[in-house]
């Protein structure tokens, strides 16, 4: 506090000493002031930090989030590319389908509502109305075209199941989205839309309040992958998953090529998330997927699959079979079959092959892990110590895995005597032997502590290489392998491509190789390897190696895709021949071709059952023991019967390979009897279709005497016909009957028929079937021949020009196989 004071010069105030309380108040004020300033600074710092965090650190993120709240980003699905065979036939395509869904919560006609005291709403279903709507929707869903409602069988299980699905879905009154059906075609979708529109219009004006209201049913566009031929080349084509992504086969290996690139449409949206009608939209167009054009030919594939299926059934093949037709010069695959397989339209369904698969899994339980285990994970055994199978296991995963596998590239096997072609090529190319090099076969041959025998323990005596290959002498090839030596043997084995993948453009080619390196090839290993019983390979590896032995020595990369095109058919990429290396010389290859032709020998050699009259065919059979599998009940090893053929033998164009894994033919295990006829059958149809060069001999006008085939097994019957230049057609109700003997044939035994006539064989009847004769007058001879062949008839053409007369009246009924004489002029 201040008080005034006086002095002589100035008038002023004198400071009075402050009290203690005053000094405390002053310090508090100063502290508060400082704290206030500090608080302002801290607050400012927080604000600045927050702004920095929002605008700088997370600025892009928040701006994107804000944009997302204002913009609607819609995906435009790219259409998946198609897959065509070599001639342009569609093997896989994509179609637009629809998912039909409903919003029961907004379908006021289906329920009555009551507001409760607590403001909640209780909805009560109207069963009669729900049943009426469900019935109408189900009829349209099952009609196929949305119009043929009367054709739907309402008593069928299919109808009852679909009806219940729709009814149950519509009954979920608090749900805003329920699926009624998927993969619905456009006609059905339009029919449902028409019904819903008409229904809502009628019930909007209803005077009866119980009939007033609406139903909310909508559709969503989606895509469906279609495979028009079903279980055809399934292991090659593969399939896509529910999202349209390739998961197996070509669909997987060419996923990025087929899929294309999705597009986008970006536009403003309103408060409820819908697009604003007048707002500007930015569209990034989708880029549809490219198409695959295969080297695979549907006709060649069908022939290979048909004869492979017959052989599997006829010989009770336990572990599936496979077949390959390949261009030996380019590696282009014309057919690749693994049977039994699956339908890529429904790959999860294995019921058609369930009995076969069940027997297979139980025959080799360790391969599929189906033994019972105790609480500690140990296998449970019976009193004899045998592992007990889990009969209640869910084998579905195993079953699908078996059927989905492409046997030609995923499974290893011992090639057996087919590999003798490779050993022979090694000997000739290395210079340690020639075709005239001889070794003696005494029926037994000792190597270290092992004793080797030939099939049937035969003693072949003194043989040159060609005779040894023809008689499939194990002992000759063991001695040849010894002369080649371990290091050189391995070098050739590697050069022929057996130590690496083939590089085929398919997924899942096994990376597991089972072979001996040079330093591991002891005396016994080398001996066993020389005739194909020590190193395991894939069927496709065997094919590419055989191709190299006959095409001049070049190892080519096999391929299934020939070219890639855009949606307009323009070629984007061509897949040409890829020669990896030359393995043997041209001269060595020529010798191999000669010896392989000697093996088939115009129907007289060891591979005679693959001979087809009119063609120069080389080949080699192989019957191998599967040393890595369980033995049969009789104690013998399970067998693999295989045969490889090349033609024309003097300058091969194609290779035909057949393999039957664990055939159970009570008569024989020999591949020359089991597999060679299958190759011959395939050749009999494929060679003329592809225009393969014949042996040059003109057989037109040649008359052939039909052999007596009644009582002969189908496999033997077709061999006889192929050798004589007669075609064959099996007429039966069940393909499994092909194991039975022929019960009837037409034309009959002893008939004189033109070369190339088709003989119709039956295994389930003692009389032939009949067919109606078409009218071919006025047609060209070639077209008339096609018409008669399609009707199951043979023909003889006399004269030239168009057909003027035919020996059987048009419309008449004759026995299938009858020869119709056509008079031309």
Question: Locations of the language-model features?
Answer:
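Sec-exported extracytoplasmic/periplasmic mature domains
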Residues: 138-146, 197, 241, 259, ...
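Beta-lactam-recognizing serine transpeptidase/beta-lactamase-like catalytic domain environment
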Residues: 6, 92, 98, 270-284, ...
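Ligand-recognition elements built from short beta-strands and adjacent flexible loops
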Residues: 575, 614, 628, 658-825
